[in-house]
């Protein structure tokens, strides 16, 4: 199994890079993980709803074009299914047993396009809270690492 994180936005603040890199390094011994940083559509100051929809479509095309054949696409969005850490660990164990490669899509500041939502095998919510997409990167990689630490009996998870 391989995990690829498809994320919109290439320039992140230093605190995001620091937090993400820490967990990214930790997870590698458990599962091969890759980050694909896709460009964010250029936005203006007073964008209309039609403009925002167009930006999401452009970013959605980037996400779909980055998918590899036979990858299971999972869309991260506030309206998705919530999982406990233990359920995530079980789900990841199942992916590994089935040999599934997984692509996790994080949208830009305006979310994911309808095309990405329709293409996704399932939708996952890290929280009912709306979060900035840079913060989602850190929360996602930490939860993936925590789930893998459970599956490998590593002492990181102490619930």
From Swiss-Prot:
Alphabetical list of Pfam families matching this protein = SPOUT_MTase
The record's subcellular location field reads:
Cytoplasm
Report the top EC class in one word.
Answer: transferase
Q: Quote the cellular component terms of the Gene Ontology held in the record.
A: cytoplasm
Range of residues in the leader sequence: none
Keyword terms, alphabetized? Cytoplasm, Methyltransferase, rRNA processing, S-adenosyl-L-methionine, Transferase
Q: What is its EC number?
A: 2.1.1.177
Q: GO molecular function of the protein, one example? A: rRNA (pseudouridine-N3-)-methyltransferase activity
In this chain, S-adenosyl-L-methionine is annotated as bound at: 76, 107, 126-131
Principal localization reads cytoplasm
* Matches recorded under CDD domains: RlmH-like
Q: Which reaction does it catalyse?
A: pseudouridine(1915) in 23S rRNA + S-adenosyl-L-methionine = N(3)-methylpseudouridine(1915) in 23S rRNA + S-adenosyl-L-homocysteine + H(+)
Q: What does this protein do?
A: Specifically methylates the pseudouridine at position 1915 (m3Psi1915) in 23S rRNA.
Q: Which family does it belong to?
A: Belongs to the RNA methyltransferase RlmH family.
Q: How does it assemble?
A: Homodimer.
UniProt-listed NCBIfam families: PRK00103.1-4 (NF000986), tRNA_RlmH_YbeA (TIGR00246)
Which protein is depicted?
A: Ribosomal RNA large subunit methyltransferase H
Q: Can you name the source organism?
A: Acinetobacter baumannii (strain SDF)
What high-level taxonomic lineage is stated for the organism? Bacteria, Pseudomonadati, Pseudomonadota, Gammaproteobacteria, Moraxellales
């Amino acid at each position: 199994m391989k995990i690829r994180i498809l994320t919109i936005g290439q320039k992140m603040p230093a605190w995001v890079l620091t937090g993400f890199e820490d967990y990214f390094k930790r997870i590698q011994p458990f599962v091969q993980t890759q980050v694909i940083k896709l460009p964010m559509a250029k936005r203006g100051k007073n964008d209309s709803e039609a403009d925002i929809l167009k930006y999401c479509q452009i970013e959605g095309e980037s996400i779909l074009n980055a998918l590899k054949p036979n990858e299971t696409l999972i869309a991260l969005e506030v309206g998705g299914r919530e999982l406990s850490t233990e359920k995530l660990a079980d789900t990841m164990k199942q992916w590994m047993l089935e040999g599934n490669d997984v692509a996790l899509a994080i949208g830009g500041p305006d979310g994911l396009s309808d095309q990405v939502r329709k293409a996704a095998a399932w939708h996952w919510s890290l929280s009912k809270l709306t979060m900035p997409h840079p913060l989602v990167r850190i929360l996602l990689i930490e939860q993936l690492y925590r789930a893998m630490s459970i599956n490998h009996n590593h002492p990181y998870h102490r619930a």
